[in-house]
């Protein structure tokens, strides 16, 4: 697991195993997978399509349960938790960013970022203040009243990032967050993610095919035969 001897990883996947059934065939996607994510560290997950990147992200984010193994969030084992408790952890400790922004089209940028906080039951005045601060930090202070259709692709994805960190999560999981963007816009979105890692010390795991961006992160790992492999 490494890092500091007394430091607890934000997320630790221990001996994760995941199989899927396809007809009469069982496909092993993850096979004894281990991965530790540390506070303030950015990790690139680079592997071919179909290797299990999305499955690993879903398990790390408690969206999917492994067939065997344990997911620790802040040192707490999650396998024995109720669905209610797992949902609470997802809402408070984990942020998600996808290739498609998944913003609610009828809501403004501000309202989209307020939503995760309102679901937690925070006061409206608090959610407005927090949402404005994050959008301003990401250079979107002039776009808060715009709906997704009125924003560029890069702006939409930055709003999605703002929404993902609205509840100050411990870990940010991103699945090809720049995959639909041109190189220049992708660079701006990636820089926004890296700024947030430094400013908030959130742990970040990004699944990406973009090796240029991956090389700018603290660690690079791949998936080979269901195992996480550290890359030089």
Curated annotation (Swiss-Prot):
UniProt keywords, alphabetically: ATP-binding, Cell inner membrane, Cell membrane, Membrane, Nucleotide-binding, Translocase, Transport
CDD domains tied to this protein: ABC_MJ0796_LolCDE_FtsE
Domain ABC transporter, chain residue ranges per copy: 11-231
A Gene Ontology molecular function term of the record: transmembrane transporter activity
EC numbers on record: 7.6.2.-
Subcellular location: Cell inner membrane
Main localization, broad class: membrane
Sequence positions that bind ATP: 47-54
Membrane-topology annotation of the record: Peripheral membrane protein
Gene Ontology terms: cellular component: plasma membrane
A Pfam short name: ABC_tran
Entry superkingdom: Bacteria
Any single GO BP term: lipoprotein localization to outer membrane
Family recorded in the similarity comment: Belongs to the ABC transporter superfamily. Lipoprotein translocase (TC 3.A.1.125) family.
Oligomeric form and interacting partners: The complex is composed of two ATP-binding proteins (LolD) and two transmembrane proteins (LolC and LolE).
Job of this protein: Part of the ABC transporter complex LolCDE involved in the translocation of mature outer membrane-directed lipoproteins, from the inner membrane to the periplasmic chaperone, LolA. Responsible for the formation of the LolA-lipoprotein complex in an ATP-dependent manner.
Protein name per its UniProtKB record: Lipoprotein-releasing system ATP-binding protein LolD
Naturally occurring in which organism (per UniProt): Nitrobacter hamburgensis (strain DSM 10229 / NCIMB 13809 / X14)
Taxonomic classification: Bacteria, Pseudomonadati, Pseudomonadota, Alphaproteobacteria, Hyphomicrobiales
Gene label: lolD
């Amino acid at each position: 697991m490494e890092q500091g001897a007394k430091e607890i990883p934000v997320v630790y996947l221990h001996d994760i195993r995941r199989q899927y059934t396809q007809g009469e065939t069982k496909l092993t996607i993850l096979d004894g997978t281990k991965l530790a994510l540390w506070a303030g560290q950015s990790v690139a997950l680079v592997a071919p399509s179909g290797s299990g990147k999305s499955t690993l992200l879903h398990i790390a984010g408690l969206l999917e349960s492994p067939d065997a193994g344990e997911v620790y969030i802040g040192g707490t084992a999650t396998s024995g938790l109720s669905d209610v408790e797992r949902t609470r952890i997802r809402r408070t400790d984990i942020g998600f960013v996808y290739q498609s922004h998944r913003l609610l089209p009828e809501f403004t940028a501000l309202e989209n970022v307020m939503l995760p906080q309102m679901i937690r039951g925070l006061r409206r005045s608090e959610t407005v203040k927090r949402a404005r601060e994050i959008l301003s930090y990401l250079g979107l202070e002039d776009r808060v009243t715009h709906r997704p259709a009125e924003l560029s692709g890069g702006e939409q994805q930055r709003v999605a990032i703002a929404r993902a960190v609205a509840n100050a999560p411990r870990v940010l999981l991103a699945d090809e967050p720049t995959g639909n963007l041109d190189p220049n816009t992708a660079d701006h979105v990636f820089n926004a993610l890296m700024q947030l890692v430094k400013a908030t010390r959130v742990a970040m795991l990004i699944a990406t095919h973009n090796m240029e961006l991956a090389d700018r992160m603290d660690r690079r790992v791949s998936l080979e035969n269901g195992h996480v492999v550290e890359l030089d």
